[in-house]
Amino acid sequence: MAEKRNIFLVGPMGAGKSTIGRHIADQLHLEFVDSDQEIERRTGADIAWVFDLEGEEGFRLREESVIGDLTEMQGIVLATGGGSVMSKEVRNKLSARGIVVYLETPIEKQVARTQRDKRRPLLQTEEAPRDVLERLAEEREPLYKEVADFVVRTDEQSAKVVANQIIEKLDF
């Protein structure tokens, strides 16, 4: 029996990784997993609380461990946290264990999609959300592109249409 393939979605917060990932999983009859939700399940606390208690460094260590475990599964669609690509270990595991899709999204769309979401610790600062998102994009975009097998823009169509575009590009 052939091994089931994995699809890993990377990109900034507000790119639609979870929404698009669910559509892909439904259509391909795969399991959908969100790495942030898995961290919350394992810790029994929300991401903001983990950030408050352990800082970003502690959170990233948990994220690295969780993504390491999840990428060992077969037949999943995984929505990763926006900063997960900062870890070389995570990038290596994503590349080695599945097809990586970078969901590229302009800053304006990210701001619009995240402005009322209080569950994003990196945006809960004195710094303007747009400035935070621009800084994060500068740091992370080269890493998203490095790890991606292909790039899909998410700003001009519905999540369902984007999911279909991704499925068309997959060699399943």
From Swiss-Prot:
Its EC number is 2.7.1.71. Signal peptide: none annotated. Substrate binds at residues 36, 60, 82, 140. One of its GO terms (biological process) is amino acid biosynthetic process. The keyword Nucleus does not apply. Pathway: Metabolic intermediate biosynthesis; chorismate biosynthesis; chorismate from D-erythrose 4-phosphate and phosphoenolpyruvate: step 5/7. Mg(2+) binds at residue 18. ATP binds at residues 14-19, 120, 157. It is found in: Cytoplasm. Catalyzes the specific phosphorylation of the 3-hydroxyl group of shikimic acid using ATP as a cosubstrate. This is Shikimate kinase. It comes from Pseudoalteromonas translucida (strain TAC 125). The lineage of its organism: Bacteria, Pseudomonadati, Pseudomonadota, Gammaproteobacteria, Alteromonadales.
